[in-house]
Each structure stands twice: as structure tokens, then as C-alpha cells.
Amino acid sequence: MPVQRKRRIKLCPLCADGVREVDYKDVNRLRRFTSDRGKILPRRVTGVCAFHQRSLSRAIKRAREMALLPYVMQ
């Protein structure tokens, strides 16, 4: 008889914090959603919802253009 496991409900960390729109100037928050090489992490890794993933990618790209975040980290 197979063992039944309860699935954990994933909750978006940004929804849990009550964040509506991600700010490109909040570099510490943006770094949590980039890899050690500076790439934007996918939703399945970070656990954010689709709305916040789009907002995060826009904010990270803006922060890169403003030189707040590097394009590539060594």
C-alpha cells in the first residue's frame, strides 16, 4: 500500500510579506531572487507567484540598467 503524503502548500514569500509591487531600489530583496552569478532565478526555485515573478524580473532589469545590480557577478 503506497504511503500518502500531504503536499505542502507553497505560499509566495512576497504575498506573505504583503508586497504589492517590487521596487527596483530595494537591492537586498532583489539579490534574494538572483543566483550567485547574477541570473534571475525561476519561479520553481524561488516559490513566488506569476504576478510577482514578472514584477521581480522587471525590477531586476531596471536595477541592472541603473547600475544598482551587476549584470554578471564573478
Curated annotation (Swiss-Prot):
UniProt-listed PROSITE patterns: RIBOSOMAL_S18
Record GO biological process: translation
Protein name as annotated: Small ribosomal subunit protein bS18
Claim: DNA damage is one of the keywords in the record: no
MF terms (GO), sorted A to Z: small ribosomal subunit rRNA binding; structural constituent of ribosome
Cited InterPro entries: Ribosomal_bS18, Ribosomal_bS18_CS, Ribosomal_bS18_sf
A single cellular component GO annotation: cytosolic small ribosomal subunit
Organism: Coprothermobacter proteolyticus (strain ATCC 35245 / DSM 5265 / OCM 4 / BT)
Annotated function: Binds as a heterodimer with protein bS6 to the central domain of the 16S rRNA, where it helps stabilize the platform of the 30S subunit.
Pfam families: Ribosomal_S18
The protein's assembly and partners: Part of the 30S ribosomal subunit. Forms a tight heterodimer with protein bS6.
Keywords, sorted A to Z: Ribonucleoprotein, Ribosomal protein, RNA-binding, rRNA-binding
Family statement drawn from the similarity comment of this UniProt entry: Belongs to the bacterial ribosomal protein bS18 family.
Superkingdom of the organism of origin: Bacteria
